[in-house]
């Protein structure tokens, strides 16, 4: 590894260090740093939030003078411990090495391992026209022709994502299934259903069950739910991070992890004859922010809106005016962040994708109207204003010829748009088959027994945390579902009281559409189906994001669903119910 000097303080500056937090900027690089002094002990880090790269400022609410606050999302970092305190018990900040040299200057050092993509380097070779072509299908799905090989990214071509909350904005090309079947390999970045689409893969498996699919070796396996899905795929390859995977003499790829969500999120570098294509997909900080520069083509998400926050929240500050202003500000921050990332990495071509979804079900009209997305053209214009990067706003079926674009960006054949009259945006969605699957769970025998609640949350395994949650089953419009369950869960001791405990405790109310929550419970699915899918309405007191709770239910639930067969057998022997304290509304 190499050692890089990030900041050098003179002996006078060292002598003037104050107790507590000190902010510094390297004027030659424009980079910011934080140095914390506690008597003779010094700790240092980059002034960059681990979440989305925001700048820290002094936290005026911290009278002890140990914490800083991010200007993007109000995350807070205790610099004395290098642990984030909002959200509580979440992340740790990467520390820098502090050293004094022989001239009594203070140095902030960063130890950098070698970039894995620089191992076994290949110089770019000249490409023939038509040799490398990238065709956009929809959302995050790209079809790459790389010589005589074809590679597809993240195929979501039919059905919803996140239960019933997301639907495709763009109409995929009519030959999408043929394209998938002709692929030599498929890369699936992570387990979210707008990238890992079981309805799409079921269609593909009916024709090519042995198609090679590659995923990263994440803590939560991408295909953790494959057996339960019923999709017959027989050639799934889990590959280690940061190692070239050779496809043929000209083509290789490398999967990298996300720096914020390494347990589930990945990105990829594809290299053909020395020309790199970087796809950061949904990663918040892909590879911890260390990425190859000056690649031939970079693509990333851009739209925002992939969260239930703040649209699904109410009470306290969550007025419609506050939500609208927050969303507007957040989208602008995301645009600036993506534009700065592109400016820093200097790819030859940049393409915004992986954000083309819509909340099209009539019951989600409020979300659709409130959850505005970024315009890809606005991002591309911002990029072009600050750099010489070529930008491409893709339309379904449009094809980019890499050789032509690298040689002459003005070549009219560099990007071939779909034929005139091609349908670009979807105007109808086949809701019913997918809603029927969800509705089937509502009348399941499991929910005839109130003891399912204790069974489910015991299976989930989250406890010893001071949080009380009220779960309320609702209809389509988030009104209490007739005969539905309304119950409390105290996660400190995993009990199910009739009333909130007397002790001081954080409290959340989660109103969930009955078809989705019961489908999730029955099948042991992750709560992203609820939260990212806009299938809940939430209130919380105090207004704190409980990272441990949500992270557990969104990513750390057991890999196998609850054993409901055994549960029902026990119920037959123990009626009228194991969990007498739970009542129905």
UniProtKB/Swiss-Prot annotation:
PANTHER family: CYTIDINE MONOPHOSPHATE-N-ACETYLNEURAMINIC ACID HYDROXYLASE, INACTIVE CYTIDINE MONOPHOSPHATE-N-ACETYLNEURAMINIC ACID HYDROXYLASE. The lineage of its organism: Eukaryota, Metazoa, Chordata, Craniata, Vertebrata. Pathway: Amino-sugar metabolism; N-acetylneuraminate metabolism. InterPro entries: CMP-Neu5Ac_hydroxylase_Rieske, Cnh, RibonucZ/Hydroxyglut_hydro, Rieske_2Fe-2S, Rieske_2Fe-2S_sf. Pfam families: Lactamase_B_3, Rieske. It catalyses: CMP-N-acetyl-beta-neuraminate + 2 Fe(II)-[cytochrome b5] + O2 + 2 H(+) = CMP-N-glycoloyl-beta-neuraminate + 2 Fe(III)-[cytochrome b5] + H2O. This is Cytidine monophosphate-N-acetylneuraminic acid hydroxylase. Sialic acids are components of carbohydrate chains of glycoconjugates and are involved in cell-cell recognition and cell-pathogen interactions. Catalyzes the conversion of CMP-N-acetylneuraminic acid (CMP-Neu5Ac) into its hydroxylated derivative CMP-N-glycolylneuraminic acid (CMP-Neu5Gc), a sialic acid abundantly expressed at the surface of many cells.
């Amino acid at each position: 590894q190499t050692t890089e000097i990030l900041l050098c303080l003179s002996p006078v500056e060292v002598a003037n260090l104050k107790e507590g937090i000190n902010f510094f900027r390297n004027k030659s690089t424009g980079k910011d740093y934080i140095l914390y002094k506690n008597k003779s002990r010094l700790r240092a880090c980059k002034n960059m939030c681990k979440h989305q790269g925001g700048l820290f400022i002094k936290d005026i609410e911290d009278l002890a003078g140990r914490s800083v606050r991010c200007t993007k999302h109000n995350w807070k970092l205790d610099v004395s411990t290098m642990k984030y305190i909002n959200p509580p018990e979440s992340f740790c900040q990467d520390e820098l090495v502090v050293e004094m040299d022989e001239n009594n200057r203070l140095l902030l050092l960063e130890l950098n391992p070698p970039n894995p993509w620089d191992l076994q380097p290949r110089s770019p070779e000249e490409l023939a026209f038509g040799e490398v072509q990238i065709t956009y299908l929809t959302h995050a799905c790209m079809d790459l022709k790389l010589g005589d090989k074809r590679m597809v990214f993240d195929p979501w071509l039919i059905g919803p994502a996140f239960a019933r909350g997301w639907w495709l904005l763009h109409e995929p090309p009519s030959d999408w299934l043929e394209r998938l079947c002709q692929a030599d390999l498929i890369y699936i970045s992570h387990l979210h259903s707008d990238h890992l689409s079981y309805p799409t893969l079921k269609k593909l498996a009916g024709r090519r069950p042995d198609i090679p699919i590659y995923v990263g070796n994440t803590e939560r396996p991408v295909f953790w739910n494959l057996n339960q899905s019923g999709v017959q795929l027989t050639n799934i390859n889990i590959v280690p991070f940061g190692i070239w995977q050779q496809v043929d003499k000209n083509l290789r790829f490398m999967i990298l992890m996300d720096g914020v969500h390494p347990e589930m999120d990945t990105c990829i570098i594809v290299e053909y004859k020395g020309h790199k294509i970087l796809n950061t997909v949904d990663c918040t900080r892909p590879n911890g922010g260390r990425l190859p520069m000056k690649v031939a083509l970079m693509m990333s998400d851009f739209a925002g809106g992939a969260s239930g926050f703040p649209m699904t929240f109410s009470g306290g500050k969550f007025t419609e005016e506050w939500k609208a202003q927050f969303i507007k500000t957040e989208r602008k921050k995301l645009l600036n962040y993506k534009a700065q990332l592109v400016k820093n990495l200097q790819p030859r071509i940049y393409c915004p994708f992986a954000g083309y979804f819509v909340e099209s079900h009539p019951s989600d009209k409020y979300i659709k109207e409130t959850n505005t997305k970024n315009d890809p053209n606005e991002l591309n214009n911002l990029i072009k204003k600050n750099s010489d990067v070529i930008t491409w706003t893709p339309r379904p079926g449009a094809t980019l010829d890499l050789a032509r674009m690298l040689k002459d960006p003005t070549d009219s054949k560099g990007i071939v748009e779909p034929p005139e009259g091609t349908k670009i945006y979807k105007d109808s969605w086949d809701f019913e088959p997918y809603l029927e699957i969800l509705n089937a769970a509502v009348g399941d025998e499991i929910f005839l027994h109130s003891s399912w609640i204790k069974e489910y949350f015991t299976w989930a395994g989250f406890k010893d945390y001071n949080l009380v949650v009220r779960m309320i089953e609702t209809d389509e419009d988030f009104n209490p579902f007739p005969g539905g369950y309304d119950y409390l869960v105290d996660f400190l001791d995993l009990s199910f009281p009739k009333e909130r405990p007397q002790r001081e405790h954080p409290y959340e109310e989660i109103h969930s559409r009955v078809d989705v929550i019961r489908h999730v419970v029955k099948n042991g699915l992750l709560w992203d189906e609820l939260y990212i899918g806009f299938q809940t309405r939430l209130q919380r007191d105090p207004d704190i994001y409980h990272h441990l709770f949500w992270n557990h239910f969104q990513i750390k639930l057991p890999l196998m669903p609850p054993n409901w067969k055994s549960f029902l057998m026990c119920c037959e022997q123990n009626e009228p119910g194991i969990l007498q304290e739970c009542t129905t509304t």
